[in-house]
Regions:
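Active-site rim helix/loop that mediates acceptor-substrate recognition in acyltransferases
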Residues: 1-15
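Acyl-donor (CoA/ACP) binding surface of acyl/acetyltransferases
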Residues: 17, 21-141
Length: 141
C-alpha cells in the first residue's frame, strides 16, 4: 500500500516531496503540492520531528525550498497554511517574505477544538527582497 502511494507521488507532476535529513536520520518532510506551472504557483508545507524543532533546521529547509521554487522551478507565488496557535512558524515565514493573506476560521479540528488557520503567501519579488538576509547564513545553492 505504501509503495503504491509513493509511486503515485513520483508520477504526479503537481506534487514533490522530500525527506528532511538531520544528523543522518530522517527528521521530517517538505512538500510542494498543487504545483501549477501555467500560473506558476504552488502550496508548500513542512514537518519537523519534535527533537529537531528549535535547532534552525526549519530556516534551512525554508531557504532551500524557496531557492528551488523561485529559481530552478521558475514559480512566481508560493502559498502555505499555519495554525494560528503556532505564531513562531508564522513569524519565521514572515522573515522569509511571506505575508498574511487571510484566515480560515475554525478550519481544523485539533485536540478536540476547532482551530483557525492563517493563510500566507510570498511572491518571487518579495522573496528576492528578503533573500539577502539569508544568503550569508545558508549560502546560495
Amino acid at each position: 500500500e505504501h509503495e503504491g502511494w509513493l509511486a503515485s507521488l513520483r508520477n504526479n507532476p503537481h506534487t514533490r516531496i522530500w525527506a528532511i535529513l538531520f544528523k543522518g536520520k530522517i527528521q521530517g518532510a517538505v512538500s510542494l503540492t498543487a504545483i501549477d506551472l501555467k500560473h506558476k504557483t504552488a502550496d508548500w508545507a513542512f514537518y519537523l520531528s519534535p527533537e529537531t524543532q528549535g535547532k534552525g533546521v526549519g530556516g534551512i529547509v525554508e531557504f532551500k525550498l524557496l531557492e528551488l521554487a523561485f529559481g530552478e522551478m521558475g514559480l512566481e507565488k508560493l502559498n502555505c497554511e499555519v495554525l494560528v496557535t503556532n505564531p513562531q512558524v508564522i513569524k519565521m515565514h514572515e522573515k522569509f517574505g511571506f505575508r498574511l493573506e487571510g484566515t480560515r476560521r475554525a478550519n481544523i479540528l485539533k485536540d478536540g477544538l476547532r482551530r483557525d488557520v492563517a493563510l500566507l503567501g510570498v511572491q518571487a519579488h518579495e522573496w528576492q527582497e528578503a533573500r539577502s538576509r539569508f544568503t550569508r547564513l545558508y549560502g546560495t545553492q
